[in-house]
Amino acid sequence: GLLEGDELTVEQALRGLMIPSGNDAATVLAEYVGKKIDPKTKNAEATFVKAMNERAKKLGCTGTVFENPHGLDFDEWAGDMHSTAHDVALMMQEAMKNDTFREVVASEDSWIEVTGADGSDHSHSMDTHNVLLGQDGNIGGKTGTTDDAGYCFTSAYNRDGDEIYTVILNSTTTDQRFTDTATLANWYYGHKVTVAIANTQEKTANGNPLMARISQTDWT
């Protein structure tokens, strides 16, 4: 875990958050970004959480409330934090547009180097919790577990350029969430069909099927 006085880059903190689910890394990132948002803030973490909720709302997440940066919901963090499968999928879709995030969640293992308060450097190795990574088009994901939420997992799949985002909430065991994820992805790709919206021998100048004939006077 991170100790007071440790120094690391934002990307290293992101790796510590996303690969081994480091709640300490989530807090560090929240405090750092919160101060960037408002240098005068007296509570950088609260400033960051406020920005989280505002960003979620802009994405169309109507069923989400964040109360802390790491997602824990018990003891000192107990409250009304919640989300939905739909909202988590929206957030995953948006996050996967970021190249750094995309590369981090696609990492099977990684390491970060942290400079301690005494100036010494020490390395931390990390292994992903995503046991599906690299299988059947799985290109990344994030686990989450609490007693109230159960075993959760959101992931991204890409098969032949068709990318989808899956969300499993409140699964019964850590293994079951991965089984459910694979089943969900396989169902989608197995039931996907291509439907021709035009069936005609006539083609337009660029080779596409002719959809309709409209007289020149109809355009005026």
Which ranges hold each PLM region?
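Active-site-adjacent loops and short helices of periplasmic peptidoglycan-processing enzymes
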Residues: 1-86
